[in-house]
């Protein structure tokens, strides 16, 4: 089996509640549900290719508007940011361990570099945080349809 890349991430209470509700239905853990949803979304993203994965309301998005069918459109940076927690509170905001193949992590790194969101890259261009891509993928999943971002 290929070596996995582990990424730890804190999710907002609202995202955790949705994942927790689904985990209770499936009689499993939040991390298991999150990993399954992310694998589904990554499959969709990788199928269309990185050049057709865009964040809404960006110049890349506007360039694709005539041809959005067959693209993967993430919510806006502001919408995603509302569902990212930065509190270092393990009791209320415990980390979730997410697992990806090396190929998937490289694909996501390409998207992070393409998005150029402040705080996600180091000065040398390497990835500091995947949180906008990961939370964006979760919010895109039909399980989060009630958020009104799909």
PLM regions and their residue ranges:
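Helix-turn-helix-like N-terminal two-helix hairpins of bacterial/phage DNA-binding regulators
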Residues: 1-40, 44
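Short amphipathic alpha-helix starts
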Residues: 3-20, 51, 55-63, 94-112
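Charge-rich, solvent-exposed alpha-helical interaction surfaces
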Residues: 18, 36-37, 41, 67, ...
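Short, locally clustered residues in the helix-turn-helix/winged-helix DNA-binding domain
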Residues: 23, 112, 139
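Short, basic amphipathic alpha-helical segments that act as recognition/interaction helices
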Residues: 26-53, 118-150
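Short, positively charged interaction helices/loops
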Residues: 43-95, 142-150
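Short amphipathic alpha-helical segments that mediate assembly, nucleic-acid/protein binding
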Residues: 60-61, 76-81, 102-105, 109, ...
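Assembly/interface hotspot detector across virion components, adhesins/toxins, and nucleic-acid enzymes
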Residues: 83-86, 114, 119-121
């Amino acid at each position: 089996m290929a070596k996995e890349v582990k990424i730890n991430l804190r999710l907002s209470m609202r995202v955790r509640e949705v994942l927790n509700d689904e985990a209770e239905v499936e009689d499993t853990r939040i991390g298991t549900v999150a990993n399954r949803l992310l694998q589904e979304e990554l499959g969709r993203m990788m199928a269309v290719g990185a050049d057709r994965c865009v964040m809404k309301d960006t110049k890349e998005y506007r360039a694709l508007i005539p041809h959005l069918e067959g693209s993967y459109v993430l919510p806006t940076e502001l919408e995603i940011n509302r569902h990212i927690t930065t509190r270092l509170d393990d009791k209320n905001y415990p980390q979730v361990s997410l697992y990806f193949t090396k190929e998937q992590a490289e694909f996501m790194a390409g998207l992070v570099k393409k998005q150029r969101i402040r705080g996600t890259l180091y000065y040398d261009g390497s990835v500091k945080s995947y949180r906008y891509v990961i939370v964006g993928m979760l919010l895109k999943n039909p399980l989060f349809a009630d958020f009104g971002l799909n």
